[in-house]
Curated annotation (Swiss-Prot):
This is Cytoplasmic tRNA 2-thiolation protein 2. It is found in: Cytoplasm. Plays a central role in 2-thiolation of mcm(5)S(2)U at tRNA wobble positions of tRNA(Lys), tRNA(Glu) and tRNA(Gln). May act by forming a heterodimer with NCS6 that ligates sulfur from thiocarboxylated URM1 onto the uridine of tRNAs at wobble position. Prior mcm(5) tRNA modification by the elongator complex is required for 2-thiolation. May also be involved in protein urmylation. Pfam families: CTU2. GO terms for biological process: protein urmylation; tRNA thio-modification; tRNA wobble position uridine thiolation; tRNA wobble uridine modification.
Length: 382
């Protein structure tokens, strides 16, 4: 079957090296252990050509990159591959192309022992753990976030933890809560990277995850931001985004975790690919959950479909001068022509930009307006 991926062991010779017995059938090709490990490693490292060792630079002027670690299969695998890559560079040249700073965002249920295990395995890197509510503290002007708090708390002096709890509790749907949490997490990661001198963020998103994000962000009304959320390059936040695992399926990463030496399974806290089940209650089902379930099922037998979604989306280009557009106060993305709020994109005769501009610090893009309708309605009606 075209594009089929199977974990079933076979007695065939590896199609790549023609020497060893294959242990996996990956994208219709039987592959042995060594060739599969090399396949995943090469897919990631070829995306990092710009991070080669710079012999012209002083050793104390090493570039620094941030790796957000969720303890999932993708970010854990990326850390493992980068660690191997740096060790290889160090053994050959006594230098490395970059230094890794690992950030874990604590959303309230983080077990510190997880990070301790990672730090023990990969001891040559810097590590930090920040609570998600620190986003209210780290952003240069937290007034833009405070504008979305319930009115009863806007005038009060609340802790950052109370502000986050109040904001999330005020949202009316599971999709809205998941969307705002993801948005705040990204803002926190970006701000930490900038404040610690990182020039790039290496996201662990796999092909499968990028495909999920493509359809989810489009469905939520934030499709205009896809060139920045899917492709490698300069982000609107004046820091580079890279997706080294963009050519590797999530299912392949789970296979890699099991076959890596030493095994990575003890460091990964995520259900096996394909195990995601949408909630039986539509009230508790998010758009992200549905997209995750869909693409994890598709990649089982038709990985080419998943790859085509990402490949096609990757062709989208950022319009000239887009970064000079007004920004959404929540997600921070440049909004085309400042068309804020529901009316800005609704196809009706109401103006979005002028109405939204009336509220200081509260201008929301269409997607964020859908997640925070109370504030979005207020913005559009002023």
């Amino acid at each position: 079957m075209p594009g089929k991926h199977s974990d079933s062991a076979t007695s065939e010779l590896c199609e790549k090296c023609k020497e060893n017995i294959s242990i996996l059938v990956v994208r219709a090709k039987p592959i042995c252990h060594d060739c599969f490990a090399r396949y995943v490693h090469t897919k990631a490292i070829k995306r990092l050509e710009s991070f080669r060792v710079n012999f012209a630079a002083s050793p104390d002027q090493q570039r620094k990159i941030l790796l957000p670690l969720s303890h999932g299969v993708s970010s854990t695998t990326l850390l493992h591959i980068l660690d191997l890559h740096l060790n290889t560079q160090r053994s050959k040249t006594n230098r490395t192309g970059f230094a890794i700073s690992v950030l874990v965002v604590d959303e309230g249920s983080l077990d510190p022992a997880r990070l301790d295990k990672v730090r023990e395995r990969y001891a040559n890197h810097d590590y930090a753990s920040l609570p998600l509510h620190d986003v209210f503290r780290l952003l240069p002007d937290d007034a833009s976030l405070r504008a979305f708090l319930p009115e009863s708390q806007v005038q009060e002096v609340c802790s950052t933890q109370e502000q986050l709890t109040s904001l999330i509790a005020s949202l009316t749907s599971a999709t809205a809560r998941a969307d705002v949490l993801t948005t705040l997490r990204t803002r926190l990661i970006v701000e930490h990277a900038k404040q610690t001198g990182c020039e790039s963020i290496l996201w662990g998103d796999s092909t499968t995850r990028l495909a999920e994000k493509t359809l989810a962000e489009t469905a939520k009304g934030r499709g205009f931001s896809l060139p920045w959320q899917i492709s490698d390059g300069k982000s609107p936040f004046d820091i580079n985004f890279h997706y080294p695992l963009r050519d590797v399926l999530k299912k392949e990463l789970f296979s890699y975790v099991d076959l890596a030496e030493p095994a990575l399974s003890a460091l990964v806290y995520e259900p096996q690919s394909g195990a995601t089940q949408a909630s039986m209650s539509s009230k508790n089902t998010t758009i992200d959950d549905l997209m995750k379930q869909y693409f994890e099922s598709v990649e089982e037998n038709f990985p080419s479909i998943v790859s085509n979604v990402v490949r096609t989306t990757g062709k989208l280009e950022v319009p000239t001068g887009a970064t000079s557009n007004p920004r959404c106060s929540l997600c921070g993305m440049p909004v085309p022509d400042g068309r804020f709020g529901i009316h800005g994109w609704g196809g009706d005769q109401h103006g979005g930009a002028d109405d939204a501009a009336a509220v200081s610090g509260g201008s929301l893009c269409y997607g964020c307006t859908r997640s925070i309708p109370q504030r979005g309605t207020a913005v559009a009606s002023k």
